[in-house]
Amino acid sequence: MTQLDQLKQFTTVVADTGDFQAMRAYAPHDATTNPSLILKAVQKAEYRPLLEQAVRDARSDSVEDIIDAVLVAFGCEILSIIPGRVSTEVDARLSFDTAATVAKARHLIALYEARGVPRERVLIKIASTWEGIRAADQLRAEGIRCNMTLLFSLIQAVACAEAGVQLISPFVGRIYDWYKKDAGAAWDPIAQGGANDPGVQSVVRIYNYYKRFGYTTEVMGASFRNTSQIIELAGCDLLTISPELLAQLQQSDAPVERKLSPEHAHATNLVRLPADEAAFRWHMNADAMATEKLAEGIRLFAADAVKLEGLIGPLRAAA
C-alpha cells in the first residue's frame, strides 16, 4: 500500500492546487486554492479557454468581477472532480476590513449558488487576522463556512475556534522556513526535523488543544516542504498537499503510522488561553515568527492578486 493510501486511512487528503487536471491522479477528497495557485494555473495554455469564458461570463467588465468569475470557474471545475469541498480565497487586500471581507464572501457564495453549487461545498478562505476572524464569525451565522488561512500561532487557532469557524489551515513549511533562516549557520536539519520540526510541532499543539477542549473546528495542516512533515502529522483531521508531494507519497510504500489522535490529545496538560482582542494582539505581538509570516503571507497573496489582474486586463479588452 502506498504512503498516500495509508495516510488516507487516518486523514482526509486535500489537493493544494488550482491545476485541477493535476489532481485527478490522486483522488483527493477536498481541494484548496489561493491567489498564487490560481495565478500559476491560468498561465497554462490548457486553461486559457476557461479564463476567456470567465471573462465573458463576468457580470460586468470590472477587473474585480472578472477575477471573482475566474475563481468560481476554477472552483466549479474542481468540484466536478472531487467529492468534497473547494476553498476559494478572499482578496488578501481585504485582510484588515471585516465588512469588506463579509461582502466579498457573500458575493463569491452567490456566484457559486448561481452555478448550482450549494454553499456546503465551498469554504471561503480568509487570512487569520483579528478582522478576518470577526468576518468568519459573522459568516458562520449566515451558513457560510470559512477556511482560516495564514495561521502561524496557537492564539490565532484559539480565536478561530472560539468564533466557531469551520476549518483552520495552520502552516508548517513557512514556520520551518522562518526558524531555519533565524538560526542561520546554527540550524541542524537532522535535530530539527521529524517530530522536532517547529512547523510540525505547531500543528500538533493546535490539534491537541482543539481535541482536549472539545472544539469542532477542523484542523487542516498546510504548506509542506517535504513528505516527512506530512507523515509526522498523520491523523490530523485534514492535510492539504501539493501535487508534487502527493506524487512522492504515491510512489513510496514505506510505512505510515498514526501520530495524532484525540485520545493522546486528551492526555496532554494544555491549559486554556484567553482569546479576546487584547489577548490576541498581545500574543501576536510577542511572537515574531507569527507576526512576520502573517504579514509576509498577506503581502505575497496581494501581490499575486495584482499580477492576476494584470493578466485579466488584456483579455477584458479583447472580449
UniProtKB/Swiss-Prot annotation:
Q: Which InterPro entries match?
A: Aldolase_TIM, TAL/FSA, Transaldolase_1, Transaldolase_AS
Q: Catalytic activity, per the record? A: D-sedoheptulose 7-phosphate + D-glyceraldehyde 3-phosphate = D-erythrose 4-phosphate + beta-D-fructose 6-phosphate
Q: Which EC number applies?
A: 2.2.1.2
Superkingdom of origin = Bacteria
**Per its record, what are the GO molecular function terms?**
transaldolase activity
Q: Which UniProt keywords apply?
A: Cytoplasm, Pentose shunt, Schiff base, Transferase
A Pfam family recorded for this sequence:
TAL_FSA
Catalytic site = 125 (schiff-base intermediate with substrate)
Q: Which GO terms describe its cellular component?
A: cytoplasm
PROSITE patterns given for it?
A: TRANSALDOLASE_1
Instruction: Say yes or no: keyword Transferase present.
Output: yes
Q: Where in the cell is it found?
A: Cytoplasm
Which GO terms of type biological process are on file? Answer: carbohydrate metabolic process; pentose-phosphate shunt
Major location, coarse class?
cytoplasm
UniProt xrefs under Gene3D superfamilies: Aldolase class I (3.20.20.70)
- Keyword Cytoplasm on entry: yes
HAMAP family in the cross-refs: Transaldolase_1
Subunit organization: Homodimer.
Protein's name according to its UniProt entry: Transaldolase
User: What's the name of its gene?
Assistant: tal
